[in-house]
C-alpha cells in the first residue's frame, strides 16, 4: 500500500512510518519534524521564518512539494493543522489531497476542536488541559485555544475535515 503521513507530533508519524515499512508498505513522511524536536522525515516541510518574503517562498515550496502528493492509497493527517500555516491557508492543501488520493484520514493527535469541547464539558475527562474534575481551568493559553479551536478558523477547518474525511484515527490505546 502507498501511504502518505502528513505532519508529526511527538514522533508519532515517524514511528508509525517505521512500523508500516517493516510490514512492506511504501510510506512517505512529510513534516516539519515537530519544529525544534527535528524528528526524522522523508520530505521536509519546516517553515524557516514567519517574515513576509520567507512566507511567500515557503508557500511556493509547498505548492511544488504537494504535486508529489498524488495517487496515495492512504493519507493520514496528524491534525487539522498539518502544515505550519494559518488554518484558512491549509484548506486548499487539504482539498488537493482529497481530490488526488484514495482516502484521507484525520488523526486525533494534539489540540483540536473536539478535544477543547470535551475538556470544557467537565464530564468527558476527569482531568484535561481545560478541566480538573467539574471545574474549568482558567489560563491565558486555554483562552487562546478556546478562541482558536471553538470559534476561530482552526475550529472551522477541523469540523470541515472531520465531516468529509475517512474516519478519524485516535492515538493507539485511546479508541
Residues of each region from the PLM?
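N-terminal subdomain of nucleotide-sugar transferases
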Residues: 1-43, 99-101
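Short N-terminal targeting/anchoring amphipathic segment
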Residues: 2-6, 66-89, 103-107, 168
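Glycine-rich, highly charged phosphate/nucleotide-binding loops
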Residues: 48-68
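Short catalytic/ligand-binding loop motif for oxyanion handling, primarily in non-cytosolic enzymes
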Residues: 12-14, 36-40, 83-86, 112-117, ...
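Active-site proximal beta-strand in glycosyltransferases
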Residues: 30, 74-76, 94-139
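Membrane-proximal helix-turn-helix segments that form the acceptor-binding/catalytic region
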Residues: 63-70, 92-99, 128-166
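Active-site regions of enzymes building and remodeling cell-envelope glycoconjugates
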Residues: 40-51, 175
Amino acid at each position: 500500500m502507498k501511504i502518505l503521513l502528513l505532519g508529526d507530533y511527538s514522533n508519532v508519524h515517524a514511528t508509525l512510518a517505521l512500523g508500516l515499512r517493516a510490514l512492506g508498505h511504501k510510506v512517505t513522511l512529510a513534516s516539519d519534524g515537530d519544529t525544534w524536536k527535528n524528528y526524522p522525515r522523508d520530505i521536509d516541510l519546516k517553515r524557516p521564518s514567519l517574515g513576509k518574503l520567507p512566507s511567500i517562498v515557503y508557500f511556493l515550496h509547498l505548492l511544488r512539494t504537494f504535486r508529489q502528493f498524488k495517487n496515495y492509497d492512504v493519507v493520514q493527517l496528524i491534525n487539522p493543522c498539518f502544515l505550519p500555516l494559518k488554518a484558512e491557508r491549509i484548506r486548499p492543501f487539504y482539498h488537493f489531497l482529497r481530490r488526488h488520493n484514495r482516502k484521507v484520514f484525520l488523526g486525533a493527535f494534539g489540540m483540536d476542536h473536539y478535544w477543547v469541547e470535551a475538556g470544557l464539558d467537565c464530564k468527558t475527562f476527569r482531568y484535561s488541559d481545560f478541566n480538573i474534575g467539574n471545574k474549568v481551568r482558567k489560563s491565558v493559553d486555554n483562552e487562546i485555544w478556546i478562541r482558536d479551536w471553538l470559534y476561530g478558523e482552526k475550529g472551522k477547518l477541523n469540523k470541515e475535515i472531520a465531516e468529509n474525511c475517512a474516519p478519524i484515527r485516535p492515538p493507539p490505546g485511546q479508541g
